[in-house]
């Protein structure tokens, strides 16, 4: 049976070569549109998410604010200024906090030989490395607990600021001046893309132990606290607990949202994922419409085939062919047509994606750094295959139903 179906299929292709080729091209192009749009969209979404997480990975940044409500006999409008001990206080009082770091911040002048440059410097603890994804490159390290305890004059640099200062020299182990105070470089951050600017790009940032920062500059108040909940889904509860604990210490209403400012990267991540899903749905819809137009072409070819083979169908039915056989014959031809065009489209898309993924993400190709690499995922393959099968089935079903419903006597008269 299947051999006969294949034979009839290729006979129809030869009989309607031009129409069949145009239909195959349309299906191929539609498949390419769906696969490439989804793959590039997924790659872009992954890269944008990576860039956002590189500025803050599941963290909340807590800033001191100004009270907006009267509380316990105190007027509103009082400033709330946090100190580094608040980090320990919150860590002890809120078990659902996984990591927390005080954060001092100011502009400093870095000098090496005759070269000097001004950049932002932060005083933090070792948790900052993971929370801000500031991972060291080879032969270097981030700050550790001993650096904090001993108030060591050590510095961790972003790759761009390090290159500006040291050019082609290896900075690790080198001494430089930070506002005329000698520091030793212990590590250089790995290059990373950062789409959310948290007080400037990390590639141009200098980082030192918060204890050293406080000793060097005499800061009393921290600029902010970085907090990572152990369970990101509990961020609202952690926020409430932060307001409760600090409200008790600084005597403000725990419901006073103006007393503290919180930059919630977890919520931003959720919103970004929803936006990414919306973009993927839009791109799929565009590709699907292209593929749907190709499906109309398949249906058109099948209707022409049914019309031209009406006499043949009548003969088959007159000698005992069942309607189910006639139905399956034309559905098979439509599905096989979609399969050939879809396979060609898949192979072409795979070639394009493979070629694009071979392009290096060097410093000179900024577009690739932000667009990311296209991802040909299993979900994309299955979704495209499912759409192709559905379009092929629908494109073949209605012409096949028409073929199976013809009257054998009338069809034998058809020329």
Set out the residue ranges of the language-model regions:
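Short cytosolic juxtamembrane segments of multi-pass membrane proteins
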Residues: 3-4, 400-415
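Generic structural signal for small/hydrophobic residues in well-ordered secondary structure
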Residues: 16, 44, 62, 90, ...
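Short juxtamembrane loops and helix-capping segments at transmembrane helix boundaries
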Residues: 55, 350-382
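Mid-to-C-terminal secondary-structure elements
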Residues: 126-143, 152-253
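Peri-transmembrane interface segments
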Residues: 226, 239-242, 253-287
């Amino acid at each position: 049976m299947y051999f006969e179906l294949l034979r009839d299929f290729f006979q129809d292709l030869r009989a309607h070569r031009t129409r069949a080729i145009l239909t195959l091209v349309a299906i191929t192009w539609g498949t390419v549109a769906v696969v490439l749009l989804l793959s590039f969209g997924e790659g872009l979404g992954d890269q944008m998410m990576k860039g956002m997480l590189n500025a803050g990975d599941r963290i909340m940044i807590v800033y001191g604010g100004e009270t907006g409500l009267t509380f316990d006999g105190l007027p509103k409008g009082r400033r709330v200024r946090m100190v580094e001990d608040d980090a320990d206080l919150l860590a002890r009082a809120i078990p659902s906090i996984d990591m927390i770091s005080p954060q001092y911040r100011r502009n400093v002048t870095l000098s090496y030989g005759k070269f000097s440059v001004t950049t932002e410097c932060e005083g933090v603890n070792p948790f900052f490395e993971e929370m801000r994804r500031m991972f060291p490159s080879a032969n270097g390290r981030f700050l550790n607990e001993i650096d904090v305890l001993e108030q060591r004059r050590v510095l961790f640099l972003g790759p761009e600021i390090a290159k500006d200062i040291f050019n082609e020299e290896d900075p690790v182990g080198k001494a430089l001046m930070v506002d005329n105070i000698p520091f030793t470089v212990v590590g250089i951050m790995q290059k990373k893309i950062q789409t959310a600017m948290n007080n400037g790009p990390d590639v141009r940032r200098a980082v030192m132990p918060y204890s050293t920062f406080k000793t060097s500059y005499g800061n009393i108040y921290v600029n902010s606290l970085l907090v990572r909940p152990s369970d990101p889904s509990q961020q609202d509860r952690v926020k409430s607990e932060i307001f409760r604990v600090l409200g008790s210490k600084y005597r403000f209403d725990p419901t006073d949202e103006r007393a503290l400012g919180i930059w919630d990267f977890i919520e931003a991540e959720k919103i970004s994922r929803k936006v990414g899903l919306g973009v993927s749905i839009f791109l799929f819809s565009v590709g699907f419409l292209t593929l749907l137009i190709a499906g109309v072409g398949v249906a058109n070819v099948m209707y022409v085939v049914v019309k031209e083979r009406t006499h043949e169908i009548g003969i088959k039915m007159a000698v005992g062919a069942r309607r189910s056989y006639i139905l399956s014959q034309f559905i098979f031809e439509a599905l096989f047509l979609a399969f050939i065009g879809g396979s060609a489209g898949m192979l072409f898309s795979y070639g394009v994606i493979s070629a694009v993924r071979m392009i290096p993400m060097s410093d000179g190709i900024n577009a690739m750094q932000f667009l990311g690499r296209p991802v040909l995922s299993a979900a994309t393959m299955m979704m495209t295959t499912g759409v192709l099968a559905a379009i092929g089935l629908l494109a073949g079903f209605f012409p096949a139903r028409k073929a199976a419903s013809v009257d054998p006597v009338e069809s034998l008269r058809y020329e």
